[in-house]
Amino acid sequence: EALEKLSKQTIEGVILDVRNNPGGLLNTAIDISSMFIKTGKIVSLRYYDGTKEIIPSIPGYYNNFLENIPIVLLVNTASASASEILAGALKDNEVATLIGETTYGKAAVQRPFQLSTGGEIWLPIARYFTPNGTDINLKGIAPHIEVKNPPKEVVSLTLTSISEEEAQQALYTTTDKPILHIEEDLQLKTALDFIVSGGK
């Protein structure tokens, strides 16, 4: 919905923020990655029973308006699991620039198993690798541009304080006056500067 709204506007670039994102569903990571990757691999899975699976971009999900604009993905040491699938897919397919810190390094794919008591337990069933075959487990994904992570409270405050209009204002401002907390959030500021410079 957000990308559809953006497609009707003239934009300079896109910034995705998965800092402090512990992950989520594998299918969701694949869906989101496919919105930015026209063709190519998203992730490969190696199951503990010895089988392998290569998951490609889903046809029809790609947004054509993203083709010629810079895309930035903000990451930090708390970006894990499904958010790392997105990071690995965007990095290996060379469609986005990663800014921030090396990610957490959790490459386990888990699924729930029902217990006879009525509860459930989540157990790992596979390990995932990036499109280029990189094993990021306990290693993480290094950003293209490394920027020290600001305090978590600053990141949280920034995310809850900046509206869409204010973020756009940050892109086009010609003054040195800080806009909200952007100047304190070095990773976000670096991403904005990168977009303004045309992705250079």
Give short role names for the model-derived ranges.
Residues 1-200:
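C-terminal "post-core" interaction segments
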